[in-house]
Regions:
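Structured, hydrophobic secondary-structure cores that serve as assembly/anchoring elements
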Residues: 1-88, 110-124, 148-393
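Well-ordered, non-membrane alpha-helical segments in soluble/globular domains
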Residues: 64, 96-103, 131-146
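Aromatic/His-enriched, Gly/Pro-containing loop or helix-boundary segments
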Residues: 85-99
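Short, T/G/N/S-enriched strand-turn elements that build extracellular solenoid repeat scaffolds
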Residues: 103-109
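Glycine/Thr-rich phosphate-binding loops of Rossmann-like dinucleotide-binding domains
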Residues: 128
């Protein structure tokens, strides 16, 4: 709106800080490279970016190189790499786990707001025919160490590898106890890739790099709320193990991993979309549900930050609620929320007596409550977002 006065022109524009709806699941590859880049996550938009940053000699032959290559050749568009050191410094599984626990790694991840997935392809280096308690304990420590990295910021998930031995993998699933299960998904088995070593043998890769690309592509093409499953992988000759060996690993009721299996005439496909969560009836057992809710939470938080500079009153609440409503309604129309009617899909609460008390307002809190039907119409989960308006004054 333009207001004209003698010698003065005032133009008022409505600034609507809408979040970027082109949500992309952006992974960070954490592991060992030919060269070390000190304590910084390097952003990649192509395989060429990787070779410029990490390659000392040609042709490149490191496991991280082939994992990143597999990511881009499966349709990945953007990723980060966080180098723990040169390949020569990786000694054994315990040292890898110790490296993942360094404080600077958490700091490097939290510094990049668009990272939402963690991939650690070097874990497959430590597969042993040993099914002892010691080996099992190392894998459980590895899983928890990566899940701890997911706490660097809300909304980050880990794509995890499992032991190559089916018996050991089943024991790990049965004995893994953690409060962070919903933030991890395990994929099995390893893959014989189409890439060749100097002896012309297939290079064995973790499935997680290709899975990260599939999730990223699925978000763009179908939406974050759709299951990243039954999707073919490129540059794969075969899984290292047949799905027939995995009877104890794919569990419809308890903790489960996700298989990569071969279908005659249909290629090598991801078969499953489960997190490690094993609570019966929990919505967090499904990757797409966990990521959808994180997606909504992130967008609503970003939207709400624009209003913490405003007075904590009914006018501000109306503006915030209006923009949040429009975004959620569009998400529902796109198929992201369940229900044939709007009130079956979501509900927004913001105001005194709805989401806040007078005491909350005096304390400088602006609280929005969001009810979401993410699986069944009119069966809601509730998010509560609290913004501290006092810190801005």
């Amino acid at each position: 709106m333009e207001i004209k006065q003698p010698d003065v022109t005032v133009t008022e524009n409505l600034i609507s800080p809408e979040p970027d709806d082109a949500f992309i699941a952006i992974p960070v590859f954490i592991g060992y490279t030919s060269s070390l880049v000190n304590k910084t996550a390097i952003k990649l938009n192509s395989l060429a970016d990787f070779t410029r940053s990490f390659t000392l000699s040609f042709p490149e032959s490191g496991l991280m190189y082939y994992s990143v290559r597999h990511f881009f050749e499966n349709g990945g568009q953007q990723a980060y790499v966080l180098s723990l050191g040169s390949d020569e410094t990786l000694n054994d599984f315990p040292s890898f786990i110790t490296a993942l626990r360094q404080v600077w790694i958490t700091q490097a991840i939290s510094a990049e707001n668009d990272i939402t997935l963690i991939v650690t392809p070097d874990a497959i280096r430590f597969n042993r025919p040993d099914t002892s308690y010691i080996q099992r304990n190392l894998w459980l420590k590895f899983w928890q160490s990566v899940l701890n990295l997911c706490k660097s910021r809300r909304g980050i998930m880990a794509l995890l590898d499992a032991p190559d031995d089916p018996e050991l993998a089943a024991k790990c699933l049965a004995q893994f106890s953690s409060n962070d299960r919903q933030w991890g998904a395990v994929y099995w088995p390893q893959l014989n890739s189409a890439y060749r070593d100097q002896a012309q043998n297939p290079i064995v890769l973790s499935p997680t790099a290709a899975v990260a690309a599939v999730i990223q592509r699925n978000d763009n093409q179908r939406g974050v709320w759709t299951a990243p499953a039954n999707i073919a992988l490129a540059k794969v000759i075969s899984p290292v193990h047949s799905y027939i060996e995995a009877n104890a690993l794919f569990n419809p009721d308890g903790a489960s991993l996700n298989l990569v299996r071969s279908f005659p005439g249909k290629g090598i496909r991801i078969w499953g979309c489960r997190t490690l969560e094993n609570t019966p009836g929990s919505l967090w057992r499904y990757i797409q549900i966990r990521r959808l809710v994180s997606y909504i939470e992130a967008h609503m938080t970003q939207l709400g930050r624009a209003f913490i500079f405003e007075p904590n009153n009914a006018i501000t609440w109306m503006k915030f609620k209006g923009q949040a409503y429009n975004w959620l309604r569009q998400l529902w129309l796109n198929g992201g929320l369940r229900g044939t009617q709007e009130d079956q899909a979501f509900e927004l609460l913001l105001g005194v007596g709805e989401s806040m008390s007078e005491a909350d307002i005096r304390a400088g809190k602006m609280i929005m409550k969001i009810k979401l039907a993410v699986l069944i119409p009119a069966e809601f989960i509730e998010l509560s977002l609290t913004f501290d308006t006092r810190t801005t004054r």
